[in-house]
Amino acid sequence: MAVYTDINEIELGAFLQQYDIGTLTSYKGIAEGVENSNYLLHTTSGSFILTLYEKRTNREDLPFFLGLMQHLASRGLECPQPVVRRDGTTIGELAGRPAAIVTFLEGMWMRRPTVEHCEAVGEGLAHMHLAGADFSLRRRNGLTLADWRPLWNLSRGRADTVEPGLVREAEADLAFLEKNWPADLPQGVIHADLFPDNVFFLGDRLSGFIDFYFACTDTLAYDVAVCLNAWCFEKDFSYNRTKGAALLRGYTSVRPLSAAEADALPVLARGAAIRFMLTRLYDWLNVPEGSFVVKKDPMEYVRKIRFHRQIETAAEYGLEQQGAAA
């Protein structure tokens, strides 16, 4: 979450007249994240999250995102739910941006995830994949293989200023992925951004997932690969196989991976790493100074890509044989 667009109390008060959520008592911007502008609202009825959708978010995608949250909640998955406006819709406009309010999810994200947290995330992700199986809307992943080279071309000219030799490395990785990207794997609704700051815990119990604004219809095992990148590396960028095994064990206890999915995991993990390297690199070079947003270092994912290049089998990530189904 982040803040790109400032709002004042007068315009916020007018916007809230369209909702039945009580009277505003306070609000504050949320700095974490990189995509939209988010505010924590406190009203006489409780706490809520207000999101103003910035230019990267297509207004036409909002029914998918908000409808997905409603669908998953109806299937028992803990996640924020859109608040319905007085006119029966869930999307309004504030400060010239499309805007929505969702319920506040109790819990905290884990800055130092444990093995147990990783297993819970794997299990929760599998439950989300199953819960989304009958969701009727579809959305193309706008940050997958076909999108990576155009995104790379926006940063290529300055990439070596971030890391000498990065152009050569990235070109080789993209060529490899374009040649080896798997096809015909099981598809469905994926979160696509399930980092630790998008997963809340109450104590050691997973209390829910947030921030579904990259969710889309894509390869389910790619979502697992995103989580391996996000949850199973240490601060020194070394891969923690124990955490990886726990995450994969949690996932496969609910939804076993097919043999084809398991075989594809090293390529999917490398692809997931380059996806986040590319968006971080673009933001690192282009996010305007003064924005109330935390820029994230693309080099974290350059180092993870270097690790994935050495991996040949899913077992090296910690996938146990009994976790894979034919």
Curated annotation (Swiss-Prot):
The gene is thrB. Pathway: Amino-acid biosynthesis; L-threonine biosynthesis; L-threonine from L-aspartate: step 4/5. Keywords: Amino-acid biosynthesis, ATP-binding, Kinase, Nucleotide-binding, Threonine biosynthesis, Transferase. PANTHER family: AMINOGLYCOSIDE PHOSPHOTRANSFERASE DOMAIN-CONTAINING PROTEIN, AMINOGLYCOSIDE PHOSPHOTRANSFERASE DOMAIN-CONTAINING PROTEIN-RELATED. GO terms for molecular function: ATP binding; homoserine kinase activity. It comes from Brucella anthropi (strain ATCC 49188 / DSM 6882 / CCUG 24695 / JCM 21032 / LMG 3331 / NBRC 15819 / NCTC 12168 / Alc 37) (Ochrobactrum anthropi). NCBIfam families: PRK05231.1, thrB_alt. The lineage of its organism: Bacteria, Pseudomonadati, Pseudomonadota, Alphaproteobacteria, Hyphomicrobiales. This is Homoserine kinase. InterPro entries: Aminoglycoside_PTrfase, Homoserine_kinase_II, Kinase-like_dom_sf, Pseudomonas-type_ThrB. Its EC number is 2.7.1.39. Pfam families: APH (PF01636). Belongs to the pseudomonas-type ThrB family. GO terms for biological process: threonine biosynthetic process. It comes from the Bacteria. It catalyses: L-homoserine + ATP = O-phospho-L-homoserine + ADP + H(+).
